[in-house]
């Protein structure tokens, strides 16, 4: 396939999460809102020198039915994780990070794009989901449902056409 790295780093680039921060499990956007290309691969490079196990921040990869975590990646310095971005690539670091205030979980994210496939679901925003062990939270469920609208972000971007 003809993959290209996202030239504008839409949603990518440098990510920095401080103590107490987290990233709930989600599916990434599938269609780039400016280029109209489909996101196919995520490359995450961890930049955490002297990261300790007790800080947490592991990247979790979940199965397509969101019933179990199938892999984790410790955010060790210079570790790279490459995974397909598709209709079932649920991932995140959902547990609050427990690092000192002067430390942060750092990573560089690069997304690779290609011509959109007809069979792919069209998501213009990340779709956040609840893990089986997450407590019921009606307010958070309402927010997840609101964000899940497939066209909720498209209205914020100008078309190149």
Model-derived features with residue positions:
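Signature of the catalytic double-stranded beta-helix
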Residues: 1-12
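Beta-rich nucleic-acid/ligand-interaction surfaces
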Residues: 11, 15-23
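Histidine-centered divalent metal-coordination motifs
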Residues: 26
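Eukaryotic charged/polar low-complexity linker/IDR segments
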Residues: 42-44
